[in-house]
């Protein structure tokens, strides 16, 4: 399945989606989908990579293994990152009215499907 199809499927199943991106841990996007232009999704994704890299480094230094998932919430949105591989992630931004558990479920499922594209 193509990346854009997977992103579209997640977005269509999660109300309040702002956007989704498949990207490397270096922050370079492979495919993105913007569902709600009221927020600057590209900026959200770019700034989130700094946090992802720091958290990944902390996880490694603690000997806790690779980073698998990270989320944070603000007054305006929630960001969820799910590892596809050790080097690639699926990052989503959701409105605070979104069902976080539902988004997490569909994003984890999507990450498993996307992992096959990197093997």
Model-derived features: positions:
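Non-catalytic interaction/Regulatory regions outside core domains
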Residues: 1-119
């Amino acid at each position: 399945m193509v990346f854009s199809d997977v992103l579209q499927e997640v977005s269509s199943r999660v109300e309040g989606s702002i956007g989704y991106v498949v990207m490397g841990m270096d922050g370079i996007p492979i495919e993105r989908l913007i569902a709600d232009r009221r927020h600057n999704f590209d900026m959200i994704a770019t700034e989130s990579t700094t946090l992802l890299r720091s958290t990944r480094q902390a996880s490694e230094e603690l000997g806790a293994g690779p980073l698998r998932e990270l989320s944070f919430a603000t007054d305006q949105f929630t960001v969820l990152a799910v590892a596809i591989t050790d080097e690639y992630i699926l990052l989503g931004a959701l409105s605070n009215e979104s069902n976080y558990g539902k988004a997490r479920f569909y994003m984890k499922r999507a990450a498993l499907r996307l992992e096959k594209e990197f093997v």
